[in-house]
Amino acid sequence: MINTNTLARPYAKAAFEFASAAQQADAWLNMLSLSAAAVQTPAVAQQLVNPALTDEQKVNVLAQICAGHIDASFSNFLRSLGSNDRLSLLPVVREQFAVLKAEAERALDVEVESAFELNAEQLQTLAAALSKRLDRTVQPKPVVNPALIGGVVIRAGDLVIDGSVRGKLNKLAEALKS
């Protein structure tokens, strides 16, 4: 079976290139978010797999749901997806579009896992330090995990910084076993 990421990638890339050239990346991300949410609702998902409907009818169903929130160029994009029976890929296309947009803006979502809830000042200080280290704009996403005991674990893309007490105890245990 073909990976949905592989199928969605060219659509996301084409959409991002078009939206960037038209300086409409934010608007396209909003339209992709709306249409992706629509295709994930059970009623719409059922219509998209209905063999009695043509590809054009499926696109029209989605376009009617999103009417007033999508423009003509996005409607054409939906028709392109529909003609290739790829409307169900919209959530993955949206996800990949968001990644491309973040890369272009040099922005990065960073998961900050801590034992206790961090206040706004702590998150801001952490974001500033990470922005300097990673040379990107950082958007911290706080996650509370009491199992860490103390400290934080930071996940930024492929980078993981484990400054938790649990992580240090695990390293100490490994050193003692050696």
Swiss-Prot record:
UniProt record similarity statement: Belongs to the ATPase delta chain family.
One Pfam family recorded for the sequence: OSCP
Tagged with keyword Chloroplast: no
Organism the protein comes from: Ectopseudomonas mendocina (strain ymp) (Pseudomonas mendocina)
Source species taxonomy: Bacteria, Pseudomonadati, Pseudomonadota, Gammaproteobacteria, Pseudomonadales
Entries under InterPro entries matching the protein: ATP_synth_OSCP/delta_N_sf, ATPase_OSCP/dsu
Record's keyword annotation contains Transmembrane helix: no
Predominant place of localization: membrane
Membrane topology according to the record: Peripheral membrane protein
NCBIfam families: ATP_synt_delta, PRK05758.2-2
Gene Ontology molecular function terms on file: proton-transporting ATP synthase activity, rotational mechanism
Keyword terms, alphabetized: ATP synthesis, Cell inner membrane, Cell membrane, CF(1), Hydrogen ion transport, Ion transport, Membrane, Transport
Protein name listed in UniProt: ATP synthase subunit delta
Subunit structure: F-type ATPases have 2 components, F(1) - the catalytic core - and F(0) - the membrane proton channel. F(1) has five subunits: alpha(3), beta(3), gamma(1), delta(1), epsilon(1). F(0) has three main subunits: a(1), b(2) and c(10-14). The alpha and beta chains form an alternating ring which encloses part of the gamma chain. F(1) is attached to F(0) by a central stalk formed by the gamma and epsilon chains, while a peripheral stalk is formed by the delta and b chains.
Described function: F(1)F(0) ATP synthase produces ATP from ADP in the presence of a proton or sodium gradient. F-type ATPases consist of two structural domains, F(1) containing the extramembraneous catalytic core and F(0) containing the membrane proton channel, linked together by a central stalk and a peripheral stalk. During catalysis, ATP synthesis in the catalytic domain of F(1) is coupled via a rotary mechanism of the central stalk subunits to proton translocation.
Protein localization: Cell inner membrane
Recorded GO CC terms: plasma membrane; proton-transporting ATP synthase complex
